[in-house]
Amino acid sequence: MEKLSTAASLFCVVVAATALAMAVVGGEAAVVEQTFMVHEMNVTHLCNTTKIYVVNGRFPGPTVDVTEGDTVVVHVINRLPHGLTIHWHGVRQMRSCWADGAGYVTECPIHPGGEKTYRFNVTGQVGTLWWHAHVTCLRATINGAFIIRPRNGKYPFLTPAKDVPIIIGEWWELDLIELDRRMLDGNFDDNPLSATINGKLGDLSNCSSTVEESFVLDVKRGESYLLRVINTALFSEYYFKVAGHTFTVVGADGNYLTPYKTDMVTVAPGEAIDVLMFTDAPPAYYHMVALANQPPPPDLQIPQLTSRGLIRYAGAAMDSNNLPMPMPVMPDQHNTMPSYYFRRNLTGLALPEQQQRHRVPAHVDERLLITLGLGSICRGGNTTTCKRGRSPETVVVATMNNVSFHHTNATALLEHYYDGRPEGVYTEDFPVRPPRPFNYTDRELIPAGPLEAALEPTAKAMRLRRFRYNASVEIVFQSTTLLQSDSNPMHLHGYDVFVLAQGLGNFDPKRDVEKFNYHNPQLRNTVQVPRGGWAAVRFLADNPGMWYLHCHFEFHIIMGMATAFIVEDGPTPETSLPPPPPEFKRCGTNGLSQP
C-alpha cells in the first residue's frame, strides 16, 4: 500500500472508514457500514511527485469485507474538484440497479463537495469482487477489493491460513483527468510508467539511485494462502507468477471454480481470480512478478510493464547466502496464447445449494453476434463521404457491430428509462449482428488499407437493446482485427454469465456450438474474449433495470466499445425494479447529482 505523508496519515486517523457490523448473532446477516472520503494526494515515484486521487488516503483503497447475505452501506464523500461515482464491480445488485454506480448510466456523478450513500445486499455470491470509480480514468487509483465470505464459514477447498488481496494496477505520472481528456481528443500516445502490485512499483523500477519499494508478503512454511488476484489496470492483461511455487485456482468473479493447478495466473482488466498458494518451498525469499501482455506489431505498442514483489518466509534472513530465487520464467509479452489456454481449462463448481443458480438456460430467446473492433466516423458530422484508412478526415472509434457508443455527460439513462422518457436520449435498436459478415480475424485488416477501409464506417449513437424479463439471452462476442487485434475483456453490470465456450478464429455456429459446455461452465461478470477469437455466453435476464455492457480496457470504453441492456420488469413487485431509494440523488441540470 502506498506510504502516506504525516498529514495524510493524520487525516486517515480522523476520517478513516470503519466497518460497523450490527446484528451479527448466530450467523445472522449484518449491516456492514463504511465511509469513503475521496480526495487528492501527492505521491512521489520515479523521482517525480504526482497528484493522485484516493479513498481514505490509501492506494489501493480500503477493502470491503462482508459475508454472503449482508447489507452493505457505503457513504461516499467527494472532496475532488470533479464528479465521481463508485461501481461495485460484479455485485449482482438484484433489484438495486440504482446502486450500481455506473456514471451516466445508472446515476449522474456525485458533485464536488457532495455526498452519496450506496446501499445494497450481497446474496448468492461468494469470493472476490472489487470496487472502483466509474467516471473518466479515476479507477486507476480509486479502487479496492470487495470480499464476500461464505455464510457458513466453509469453503469447498482447504481453509487458508490467511487470504491476501493482490491488486495489480498501473502507475500513471500524467494526471488521470488530463489522461481522459487526451484520449477523448483522440490522443492515445500516453502510457503508464510501471505496473504495480498493491500500489508498489517494485524494485525493477528506479530513477537515479532510488529503487522503488516492493510489495512483500510474509508467510510461514507448510500453510496455504488464498491470493485474491485483481486486475485494476486501465490498459493491460497481466501474467502473474511466484518463483518456486504453484497455484490452485479455486474461484473467479465471486463464484467457485473446479480446482485447477497451474504455475501462472492470467488476469484481464476487471477480473478477480482466487488462487491457493501452498508454502511448501524451502524457507527463503521468492519473487512474485506481474507482467503485462500485448499483441505483437503491427498493433500499436506500449512499453513493457512489469512489477516485482517478494514472498518472504519466516526465518529466512536476507544476506549474501540467501538471496531471492531467480525471477520466475515469464511468457514473452507478445505471446497471448497462455491467456487463452488458461481460461479454456477453467470450469465452474456449483455447491448443492447453488444448483438452481448454476443451471444453464436450455432454450434461447434472444441471440446476438457482437463484433468487437475499431472503426471510424467522419469529422464534422458527415457519416458517408469521407476518406477512410486512418485518414485525417476521420476519427478512429471503438465499435460493437459498427456502432460506437455516444457517451452522455448530461444525464443518466436509468432515470430516462424509469420515467418513460427515452426520446432524444437513446434508441432501442442496438443491432443483433454486424451489418455484413466478413473474415473477422483476417490479419490483413490490421494495417490501414483498402481491405479494412470498406468496413470502417461506424455510427456514433446511443443504441441500446431491450429484453423482456426472464428472457434467455445468448451472445457470441467476436474479436476482430479491424485496425488492431486486441483481446477484449467484456464486463456486463448486474449479471453473471455462463461462459459456454471460447475459441480462436471466426465463430462457426454449425461447428462451434458442439463445443458448448452446458454441464459446468464458469459464471463470470467479465469475459476475456481472446485476441483473434470469440467467446459464447448465456444468461437469464432476471434482474430488471439498465445494465452497462462494455470492454474493460479504458481506451476502448472511451472510444465507444459499449452499450446498455434494458431488462423489463417482471409480473410482480418482487420481480420489478423498485423506485429509487430515498438516498438516491437525481441528475441536476449540469450533468452532476443534485445537491
UniProtKB/Swiss-Prot annotation:
Signal peptide (UniProt feature, chain positions): 1-29
Residue segments, region Disordered: 570-595
InterPro entries in UniProt: Cu-oxidase-like_N, Cu-oxidase_2nd, Cu-oxidase_C, Cu-oxidase_fam, Cu_oxidase_CS, Cu_oxidase_Cu_BS, Cupredoxin, CuRO_1_LCC
Binding positions (Cu cation 3): 134, 493, 550
Gene3D superfamilies in the cross-refs: Cupredoxins - blue copper proteins (2.60.40.420)
Cell compartment(s), UniProt: Secreted, Extracellular space, Apoplast
UniProt domain Plastocyanin-like: residue ranges: 37-153, 162-316, 429-571
Keywords, ordered alphabetically: Apoplast, Copper, Glycoprotein, Lignin degradation, Metal-binding, Oxidoreductase, Repeat, Secreted, Signal
Catalytic activity: 4 hydroquinone + O2 = 4 benzosemiquinone + 2 H2O
Binding site for Cu cation 1: 87, 491
EC number of the protein: 1.10.3.2
Chain residues that bind Cu cation 2: 89, 132, 552
NCBIfam families linked to this entry: laccase
Protein name: Laccase-18
Gene symbol of the encoding locus: LAC18
